[in-house]
Amino acid sequence: MKLENQSDFYLLYKPNSWTSQDLCTFFKKKYKFQKVGHSGTLDPSAEGLMLIATNKYTKLFDYIDNTHKTYEFEALFGFESATNDTDSELVEIESINLESKLEELDKGISGLTGNIKQVPPIYSAVKVKGKRLYKYARQEKEVELPIRD
């Protein structure tokens, strides 16, 4: 299939353990595109569909409403980790009131609609001064976390 000169949008599945850039690089090399970009970043441990643009269409991302997203997740109660996910060692919490945790989760999720302000976790791909936050975290360097819409 000859696609290298085509400008278009694609929905591609990003598997667990790949970075968003890994997916773009693979797609670009496989079909010999001049330029490939993505509309947002998924964590390496996340999997799902990503909107990918090729060639001239990469410039159109500025005009795409990127606010309507749906997330599915699985939660593991009774553990905590330095990275707030399963990428670092899980430490079991002595005791947990599952009913109150489910109520907390319900309250938290109900507030995640519309335009919201968030402070990203230190282990995230958000950039501060051109550097990903997780790199500051791995180097144990303090950095001010940005508030984002």
Question: What does each of the following model-derived ranges do?
Answer:
Residues 1-149:
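Catalytic/RNA-binding core of pseudouridine synthases
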